[in-house]
Regions:
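N-terminal Lys/Arg-rich, disordered targeting/topogenic segments
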Residues: 1-9
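A structural signal for multi-pass alpha-helical bundles of membrane permease subunits
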Residues: 7, 13-298
Length: 298
């Protein structure tokens, strides 16, 4: 019988000073990771405290403690008692669902088309438009929000719900545009030349050749974009006050909620992050794999 060759890890191949440096870096990243996770764990613990006794318990036991009795009913109360502008918590979840769905669909579609055109086609004014697009992303939102608010009011898009979202998601520029631009720029144009020789059109090149190759990376970016839309409270707060999402609704509730209602509010926060954790948990592995682009075989 052949002996099984013992595999050596990367750590065992390092010198002693390298192992020390590696251990220090690992410890620092571990501390950083714990510092990010701990607030959510603490919030989950406080969400199980009795609403009326939270302040008293914190004064007696300190800020960090585990309740003697766990009140899981706080999560039911989050659905039944919390509301904003006449919309209950379930309604806010539904608003967030279509907010993410519509915003993600229109954003990814138009950004992919715009990025592909700027990456693969040369036309007059291309550099000027590209520069203006980059400049618009540099300008702080506080500097453009006033003009944007007035424009939406003049176009009767203010507080129009899905209509506002469909129109504003068709801009074609943004952080996603820059990433897609790099993806399409790295796909060989030889694919398109082969299609043109066979009589294919520009639409055929994009929808049948380029987009399928970029789709894995686009899907990975869609996850991050979707999470950003789910957590986006500013847009709904400023331009869609009648249709509060989970993010904007919980933000407004936090401004006037009493101390007795804090555990129920924390329960609502925990519920709001569950969809994000589920999606990211299932997609995190494929996100890293799908950020590579295939190439031509020689």
């Amino acid at each position: 019988m052949s002996k099984k060759v013992k595999e050596t890890s990367i750590l065992t191949q390092r010198s002693k000073p390298e192992k020390i440096v590696f251990g220090i870096i690992f410890a620092l990243f571990l501390i950083y990771a714990v510092s990010l996770i701990f607030p959510f764990v603490w919030m989950a613990v406080l969400s199980l405290e009795e609403a009326k006794s939270l302040n008293t318990a914190m004064k007696l036991n300190g800020a960090f403690y585990i309740p003697e009795v766990l009140y899981f009913s706080n999560y039911i109360d989050a659905f039944t008692t919390m509301e904003d502008n006449g919309v209950n918590f379930i309604g806010m979840l539904m608003n967030s669902a279509w907010f993410v769905g519509i915003g993600l669909l229109f954003t990814m579609f138009w950004h992919s088309i715009t990025a592909y055109i700027f990456a693969k086609y040369k036309f007059k004014g291309r550099n000027f438009i590209y520069t203006c697009a980059i400049f618009s992303m540099i300008v702080p939102i506080i500097g453009s929000s006033g003009a944007m608010y007035r424009l939406m009011a003049e176009l009767n898009l203010y507080d129009s719900g899905p209509l506002y979202l469909m129109v504003t998601s068709c801009g074609g520029f943004g952080g996603t545009f820059l990433m897609m631009y790099g993806i399409f720029a790295n796909i060989s144009w030889s694919y398109a030349e082969a299609v043109f020789i066979d009589g294919g059109s520009d639409n055929t090149v994009f929808f049948r050749i380029m987009l399928p190759q970029a789709l894995p990376a686009i899907a990975a970016m869609a996850v991050n974009t979707g999470i950003g839309l789910w957590n986006n409270y500013g847009t709904a707060l400023m331009y869609m006050p009648s249709t509060p999402t989970v993010a904007s609704g919980l933000y407004k509730i936090s401004l006037y909620i009493s101390d007795h209602g804090r555990p129920i509010y924390y329960a609502g926060l925990i519920i709001s992050i569950i969809p994000v954790l589920i999606i990211y948990g299932f997609m995190s592995g494929s996100m890293m794999k799908n950020l590579s682009i295939g190439g031509l075989k020689g």
